[in-house]
């Protein structure tokens, strides 16, 4: 019975996302009949500020936000939190640095994907095709990692098998991405971002209660693990690691295709400016709260790492199970699942657009063979399904 209670909230959430995507498909029929590629891959450039902010934040966050990051924070302490703080400005920089410029260029050349911009800028089909191949190859690998991480967390928290979780949210994310397209992904991403924030708040409350309150938790950490309160964590967080991580997760993420394409999709300048502000607050809340939860979980899971499977990836699943009732644990699991599927859906759509729009349609265009809107629809849906499966 407890296992059923664990799975019900997540299943209900996934069905809600599927319903939203089906609704988006019905409301987008007219636009897709006019220009399927533009509506399916960038939502017809109609995203408002709130949805743009939430979809960018949800896409940037992943299962590591809930599992890997907090797990490392359990070992290192506040030093990992200080490292993670650079992620607060990511959305502001992505939309602020690339957003407006990429939007102006995309509208001028009628670009639908980032690779369209590369092809127009460098006049090189070879470069564009290579970029498409790289995107598909690495995005597929990333999607596998996301699914595996979420499925293992699902198994640890709910008691259901790894394959059950993988099949359940794997199939649903493929279906809703396929039928909803970019607009469906954007709206469901917004729901996922909200679910992540709610889940983190519940988990934080559960952790505080299980640990006897903030003062008791911090008293234990300061007494038993004082190194966790130091920025360098007594050598565990050297300056070189700070610099490399700040560059990697703060600067180098600016050009991620799945994030940059959001700059092609927004409605107007007002939407962009609103998204920069909202997105910064949201990603800051998700990243910092999740990492901080990892730190305070040290006051709940007080044993050595060998007691928890000798892996930091086991820390958060065990902490969730020990801190919350089965029902609330099932609610919390929505957060990591939402982080996973919001990332996977964006990667899936980007990979599909790379194959259909950037490679196949370009080859046909060079041969002066025009594809009908219906053909583009079938190829796009087919590519999304095949890549997802």
Which stretches of residues belong to each language-model region?
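Membrane-interfacial loop-to-helix junctions in multi-pass transporters
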Residues: 45-50, 122-129, 158-168, 233-239, ...
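Membrane-interface helix-loop-helix modules in multi-pass membrane proteins
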Residues: 39-110, 241-253, 259-261, 265-305, ...
């Amino acid at each position: 019975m407890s296992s059923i209670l664990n799975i019900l909230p997540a299943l209900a959430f996934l069905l809600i996302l599927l319903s939203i995507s089906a609704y988006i498909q019905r409301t987008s029929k007219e636009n897709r009949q006019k220009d399927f590629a533009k509506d399916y891959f960038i939502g017809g450039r109609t995203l408002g500020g709130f949805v743009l902010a939430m979809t960018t934040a949800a896409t940037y966050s992943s299962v590591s936000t809930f599992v890997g990051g907090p797990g490392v924070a359990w070992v290192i302490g506040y030093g990992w939190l200080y490292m993670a703080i650079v992620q607060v400005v990511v959305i502001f920089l992505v939309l602020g640095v690339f957003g407006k410029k990429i939007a102006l260029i995309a509208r001028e050349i009628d670009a639908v994907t980032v690779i369209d911009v590369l092809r127009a800028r460098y006049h090189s089909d070879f470069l564009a095709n290579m970029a498409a191949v790289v995107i598909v190859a690495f995005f597929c690998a990333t999607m596998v990692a996301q699914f595996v991480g979420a499925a293992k967390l699902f198994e640890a928290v709910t008691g259901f098998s790894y394959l059950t979780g993988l099949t359940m949210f794997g199939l649903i994310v493929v279906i809703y991405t396929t039928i909803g397209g970019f607009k469906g992904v954007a709206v469901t991403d917004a729901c996922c971002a909200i679910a992540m924030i709610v889940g983190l708040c519940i988990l934080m409350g559960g952790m505080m209660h299980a640990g006897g309150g903030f003062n008791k938790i911090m008293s234990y950490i300061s007494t038993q693990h004082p190194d966790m309160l130091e920025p360098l964590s007594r050598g565990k967080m050297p300056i070189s690691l700070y610099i490399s991580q700040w560059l990697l997760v703060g600067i180098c993420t600016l050009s991620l295709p799945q994030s940059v394409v959001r700059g092609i999709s927004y409605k107007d300048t007002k939407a962009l400016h609103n998204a920069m502000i909202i997105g910064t607050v949201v990603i800051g809340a998700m990243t910092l709260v999740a990492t901080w939860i990892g730190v305070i979980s040290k006051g709940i899971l007080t044993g050595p790492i060998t007691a928890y499977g000798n892996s930091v990836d086991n820390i958060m699943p065990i902490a969730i199970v020990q801190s919350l009732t089965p029902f609330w644990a099932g609610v919390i699991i929505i957060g990591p699942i939402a982080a996973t599927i919001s990332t996977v859906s964006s990667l899936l759509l980007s990979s599909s657009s790379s194959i259909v729009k950037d490679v196949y349609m370009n080859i046909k265009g060079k041969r002066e063979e025009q594809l009908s809107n219906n053909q583009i629809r079938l190829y796009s849906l087919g590519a999304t399904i095949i890549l997802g499966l």
